[in-house]
Amino acid sequence: MKPETFYNLLAEQNLPLSNQQKEQFERYFELLVEWNEKINLTAITDKEEVYLKHFYDSIAPILQGLIPNETIKLLDIGAGAGFPSLPMKILYPELDVTIIDSLNKRINFLQLLAQELDLNGVHFYHGRAEDFAQDKNFRAQYDFVTARAVARMQVLSELTIPYLKVGGKLLALKASNAPEELLEAKNALNLLFSKVEDNLSYALPNRDPRYITVVEKKKETPNKYPRKAGMPNKRPL
């Protein structure tokens, strides 16, 4: 996808980009490729592929009407090079975005990126999702949590649901639809007082299938969740 195609597709969906936003995406691409030489951020470095499979793919929650352009608090778990939250932040500057990542080198990249792109209302923290979720400054503080290809729902739900306010939503972006994954996660979702509200399917412009599972938090999460770092993965609920 050429940058011009990206701009035109957004304009067609009533999301025209300003020159500043176009420059932000361009600089994002340049820094991604530059830093990818030093640390492993992505296997995708071809410009047209980045615009399609990182930038366009990341803004799917906006294109699907799941996220409003308001000052809402969004947490991105395991964002890696900032996907999906930072492309959404460029598109919707009002979003208040927090990223937690377990690799400090990636956090360094994100801090520089935010500075270069002149993004305000972005916060980056180095550490494990399980640890921050027990901190009252993070627990039950967010309207949305996003996760793009991070873990199976059975594990992901324990890592993310505790961060949500009651009524808040987890948006899990995936490249494959696995109904059995949601069946597996049924017990975990019950224990975490949350429920699958929707399982959206759509296609990228190149016809690659994509899915967003929407999970709503119904009640406060029991204090014992999430368990200690590593446990959700080792012994899923």
UniProtKB/Swiss-Prot annotation:
It is found in: Cytoplasm. S-adenosyl-L-methionine binds at residues 78, 83, 129-130, 148. One of its GO terms (molecular function) is rRNA (guanine-N7-)-methyltransferase activity. Residues 218-237 are annotated as: Disordered. InterPro entries: rRNA_ssu_MeTfrase_G, SAM-dependent_MTases_sf. Its main location: cytoplasm. Belongs to the methyltransferase superfamily. RNA methyltransferase RsmG family. The gene is rsmG. GO terms for cellular component: cytosol. Keywords: Cytoplasm, Methyltransferase, rRNA processing, S-adenosyl-L-methionine, Transferase. It comes from Streptococcus pneumoniae serotype 2 (strain D39 / NCTC 7466). Its EC number is 2.1.1.-. Specifically methylates the N7 position of a guanine in 16S rRNA. It comes from the Bacteria. This is Ribosomal RNA small subunit methyltransferase G.
